[in-house]
């Protein structure tokens, strides 16, 4: 399990961590990272981003055999590269599968968070976790209080009086509004892909 591997390799390093999808690494995500780095520098904590792969919406769409699956802004390799470019020390993903889907909030804390040397946890104000999204900030704050871990809630980051979100960026891209997408991402929208070509008749000669 990548958590056990991470803990074995980096267990001696105290962490400031956050959890989320971080699709596109937009302005709101960058604000969280900025705060993480500031606190981490002050308190001598390494920064860690935990995300799920695939995206939960993609997982549920596949389970329901939906043709139009949710479009992600960037693949996970691009996400990791941009996290590195933004000076995040560590990042790893949790495989979103039926096992993770069915985890209660208590199990998630026991099997994921408690295995990491987290001293400070930062989450978005809309963060939910565990089976049926039953875990929330108050649940994590109570866990943190009992384990001497600071749990902090990050307020909504807004632009044009609307919460910046990956969903909004996907909408702007789908509508062809790349200027808005660029403002929300704080960079030009790009994507990477693999191209497959069929051999030409000449290749068989």
Model-derived regions: residue spans:
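Active-site-proximal cofactor/substrate-binding loop regions of enzyme domains
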Residues: 46-61, 65-110, 115
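Conserved residues at the C-terminal ends of beta-strands
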Residues: 94, 124, 204
């Amino acid at each position: 399990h990548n958590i056990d591997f991470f803990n074995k390799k980096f267990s001696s390093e105290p962490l400031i961590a956050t959890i989320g999808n971080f699709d596109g690494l937009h302005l709101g995500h960058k604000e969280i990272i900025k705060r993480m780095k500031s606190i981490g520098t002050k308190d001598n904590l390494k920064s860690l981003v935990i995300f799920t792969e695939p995206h939960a919406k993609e997982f549920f769409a596949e389970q329901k055999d939906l043709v139009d699956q949710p479009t992600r802004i960037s693949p996970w390799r691009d996400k990791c590269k941009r996290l590195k470019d933004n000076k995040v020390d560590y990042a790893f993903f949790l495989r979103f599968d039926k096992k993770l889907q069915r985890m209660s909030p208590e199990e998630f804390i026991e099997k994921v968070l408690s295995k990491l040397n987290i001293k400070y946890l930062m989450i978005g104000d809309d963060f939910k976790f565990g089976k049926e999204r039953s875990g929330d900030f108050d649940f994590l704050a109570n866990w943190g209080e009992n384990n001497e871990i600071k749990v902090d809630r990050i307020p909504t980051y807004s632009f044009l009086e609307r919460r910046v979100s990956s969903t909004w960026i996907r909408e702007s891209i789908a509508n062809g509004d790349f200027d808005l997408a660029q403002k929300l991402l704080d960079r030009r929208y790009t994507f990477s892909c693999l191209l497959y070509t069929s051999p030409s008749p000449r290749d068989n000669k």
